[in-house]
């Protein structure tokens, strides 16, 4: 089971260093719905 606390707070995408919300957890893989990712 993944720790929700890790996804709960904003996480920096690997490589990009941009912050993403838990909803945009897939931002690091290229998928981002909400939050600043690119």
From Swiss-Prot:
Domain notes: The presence of a 'disulfide through disulfide knot' structurally defines this protein as a knottin. The cysteine framework is VI/VII (C-C-CC-C-C).
Similarity annotation: Belongs to the conotoxin O1 superfamily.
Superkingdom classification of source: Eukaryota
Entry keywords, A to Z: Amidation, Calcium channel impairing toxin, Disulfide bond, Ion channel impairing toxin, Knottin, Neurotoxin, Presynaptic neurotoxin, Secreted, Toxin, Voltage-gated calcium channel impairing toxin
Site (Important for calcium channel binding) location in chain: 25
Key word Membrane present: no
Species per Swiss-Prot/TrEMBL record: Conus fulmen (Thunderbolt cone)
Main localization category: secreted
Function text: Omega-conotoxins act at presynaptic membranes, they bind and block voltage-gated calcium channels (Cav). This peptide reversibly and selectively inhibits Cav2.2/CACNA1B (IC(50)=11.5 nM) voltage-gated calcium channels. Channel time recovery after toxin exposure is short (about 50 seconds). In vivo, it effectively and dose-dependently reduces nociceptive behavior in the formalin test and in neuropathic pain models, and reduces mechanical and thermal allodynia in the tail nerve injury rat model.
Alphabetical list of PROSITE patterns matching this protein: OMEGA_CONOTOXIN
Subcellular location: Secreted
Key word Iron-sulfur present: no
GO cellular component: extracellular region; host cell presynaptic membrane
Full protein name: Conotoxin FVIA
Disulfide bonds: 13-28, 20-32, 27-37
Misc. remarks from the entry: Negative results: has no significant effect against all Cav subtypes tested, except for Cav2.2, as well as against TTX-sensitive sodium channels of mouse DRG neuron.
Tissue expression from the record: Expressed by the venom duct.
